[in-house]
């Protein structure tokens, strides 16, 4: 029975009517578009039979070119030829300048600190550049299918954060495309692989593209694709292989580090050509800037070995998250052009103890999976029982009193998902509540990441604990988070969609997870202390209000005993002895029991005053 039917109301077509849909792999280095024709998913080629479209755009005053034509201008007009724009999506200018200091583009910052690229066509942001690539792919599909597309599925790296995913959606909208769904690239590969092989069990999807690395551990069972865990690096890929090799060639050739952009581009082109050749040959001759030399596969392997090791460390973390051992993995699916590098295949095979699968073209498999999914979502396969369960990489929650984090959705929860929890007011007469959305695995706010803040106003003025606020976290199929807070009695609500301007790297995510394990015992103790301090503050706040209203109900001796107990609680609450605070709270409760009973009796008498027994 289906756990999650992937279909959208209103999109099912009549039996005789077929809607046109496409899957788009919007890659860092190359992009592809695919569709399903006659029951088979296939990538679409250009007029020259080329399936890959270089993710490069060349801008001029009178227009722009995309793909191969644009790439030929890279060395001639570097500043106006934008490549690997996917790496810039959702990042601030400061982040880009820190991560990629050698980019040959001139940047300006927008008012909110986001990057604007200076080109002959004016200031352009990464969303606009991505939109131009998507337009070129859509035009190829429209021509091949002889009709306008009804919808597309676009793939993104599993580690893309909210801002990067939203930027991809915005680019598609700018390109005039209806986005059926954003799909994680490893998951798209699982769809293509699962349909073609029909195997069941645990599968690892190792996706090393031009600019990103993703590892996904999936369980395939009777048409259900469940992502058990994900990991990776949003800033590691074949481009890094190219730059390492280019730097090595530059050193061997004696080319100055600060040479002009044209020489830098020649170096990079030579490195790319050498990398490709070394996948088949043991050595290759390189000619660049008047220098000629030999590069061996062994030398290349030494350069990239640390990067390959980083990918395997991410694989190890993902396996741990999934709760499986490497020998439980039945197959390893290779995705991305960079998996053609022999050292990558060799080390991955050694790590998992089996040769990786390479029967499906690693450049095309993601686009093929996206096309299959698009065909379902557009309504051409309304009875399909394919299931697709993605996960969120870090827990989501709220700040509560005392600087604590209350987790609402734990990490590795499958998405889409909606979870709700009820909260209440801390003070008498409280009419507003600040909602602080957190991300992370630790117990205290100071150790987690702040995502967003918003306020719920218009809460009825009731005694502390009298108002009930339901906070709902909803993560959609694209990984975008919406948080809604609603006061139950009035229905007043406030909400926010979380779109951070830039997100976390995989190393930061891994560090947060590691810290949560390393400091688990310490965090639990800190949480217990914070909870007791919050309870102490609540008790004292309530007691002070009661004394201000009804102190006349107490004798002098009783008042003194209560004051002494409250003073002691106030004192120990400043320390870090959890047991002492707990005992002091119990003592205040003991000293005020009679006082509370008298206040209750007085309230009842006041309520009954002026009423007859019959009325009661």
From Swiss-Prot:
GO terms for molecular function: ATP binding; ATP hydrolysis activity; ATP-dependent protein folding chaperone; unfolded protein binding. It holds the Pfam family HSP70. Keywords: ATP-binding, Chaperone, Nucleotide-binding. One of its GO terms (biological process) is iron-sulfur cluster assembly. The keyword Transit peptide does not apply. SUPFAM superfamilies: Actin-like ATPase domain (SSF53067), Heat shock protein 70kD (HSP70), C-terminal subdomain (SSF100934), Heat shock protein 70kD (HSP70), peptide-binding domain (SSF100920). PANTHER family: HEAT SHOCK PROTEIN 70KDA. Belongs to the heat shock protein 70 family. Chaperone involved in the maturation of iron-sulfur cluster-containing proteins. Has a low intrinsic ATPase activity which is markedly stimulated by HscB. Involved in the maturation of IscU. This is Chaperone protein HscA. It comes from Escherichia coli O127:H6 (strain E2348/69 / EPEC). The gene is hscA.
């Amino acid at each position: 029975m289906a756990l999650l039917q992937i279909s959208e109301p209103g999109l099912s077509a009549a039996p005789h009517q077929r809607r046109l849909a496409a899957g788009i792999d919007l890659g860092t280095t190359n992009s592809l578009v695919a569709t399903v024709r006659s029951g088979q998913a296939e990538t679409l080629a250009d007029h020259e039979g080329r399936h890959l479209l270089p993710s490069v755009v060349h801008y001029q005053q009178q227009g722009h070119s995309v793909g191969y034509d644009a790439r030929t201008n890279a060395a001639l007009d570097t500043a106006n030829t934008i490549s690997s724009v996917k790496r810039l999506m959702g990042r601030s200018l400061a982040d880009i300048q820190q991560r990629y200091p050698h980019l040959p583009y001139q940047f300006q910052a927008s008012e909110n600190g986001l990057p604007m690229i200076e080109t002959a066509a004016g200031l352009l942001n990464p969303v606009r550049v991505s939109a131009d690539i998507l337009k070129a792919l859509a035009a190829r599909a429209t021509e091949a299918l002889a009709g306008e597309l009804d919808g597309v599925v676009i793939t993104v790296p599993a580690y893309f954060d909210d801002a990067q995913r939203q930027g991809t959606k915005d680019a598609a909208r700018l390109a005039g495309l209806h986005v059926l769904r954003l799909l994680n690239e490893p998951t798209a590969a699982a769809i293509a692989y699962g349909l073609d092989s029909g195997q069941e069990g645990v599968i690892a999807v190792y996706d090393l593209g031009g600019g990103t690395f993703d590892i996904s551990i999936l369980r395939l069972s009777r048409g259900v694709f469940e992502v058990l865990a994900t990991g990776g690096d949003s800033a590691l890929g074949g481009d890094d292989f190219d730059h390492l090799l280019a730097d090595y060639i530059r050193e061997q050739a004696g080319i100055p580090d600060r040479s002009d952009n044209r020489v830098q581009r020649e170096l990079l082109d030579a490195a790319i050509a050498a990398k490709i050749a070394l996948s088949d040959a043991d050595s290759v001759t390189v000619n660049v800037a008047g220098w000629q030399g030999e590069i061996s596969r062994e030398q290349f392997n030494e350069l990239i070995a640390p990067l390959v090791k980083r990918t395997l460390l991410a694989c190890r973390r993902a396996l741990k998250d999934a709760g499986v051992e490497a020998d439980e993995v039945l197959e390893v699916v290779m995705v991305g052009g960079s998996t053609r590098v022999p050292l990558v295949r060799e080390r991955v095979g050694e790590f998992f103890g089996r040769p990786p699968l390479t029967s499906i073209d690693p450049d095309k498999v993601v686009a093929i999976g996206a096309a299959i999914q698009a065909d379902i979502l557009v309504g051409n396969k309304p009875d399909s029982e394919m299931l697709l369960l993605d996960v969120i990489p870090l827990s989501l929650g709220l700040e509560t009193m005392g600087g604590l984090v209350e987790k609402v959705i734990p990490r590795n929860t499958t998405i889409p998902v909606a979870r709700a929890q009820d909260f209440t007011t801390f003070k008498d007469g409280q009419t507003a509540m600040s909602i602080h959305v957190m991300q992370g695995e630790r117990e205290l706010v100071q150790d987690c990441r702040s995502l967003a803040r918003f306020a719920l106003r218009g809460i009825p003025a009731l005694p502390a604990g009298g108002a009930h606020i339901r906070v709902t976290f909803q993560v959609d199929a694209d990984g975008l988070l919406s948080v809604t807070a609603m006061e139950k009695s009035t229905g007043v609500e406030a909400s926010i969609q979380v779109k951070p301007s830039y997100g976390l790297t995989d190393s930061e995510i891994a560090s947060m997870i590691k810290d949560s394990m390393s400091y688990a015992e310490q965090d639990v103790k800190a949480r217990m202390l914070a909870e007791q301090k919050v309870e102490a503050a609540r008790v004292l706040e309530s007691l002070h209000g009661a004394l201000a209203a009804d102190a006349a109900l107490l004798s002098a001796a009783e008042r003194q005993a209560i004051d002494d107990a409250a003073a002691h609680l106030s004192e120990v609450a400043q320390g870090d002895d959890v047991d002492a605070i707990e005992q002091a709270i119990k003592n205040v409760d003991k000293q005020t029991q009679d006082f509370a009973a008298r206040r209750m009796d007085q309230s009842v008498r006041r309520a009954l005053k002026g009423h007859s027994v019959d009325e009661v």
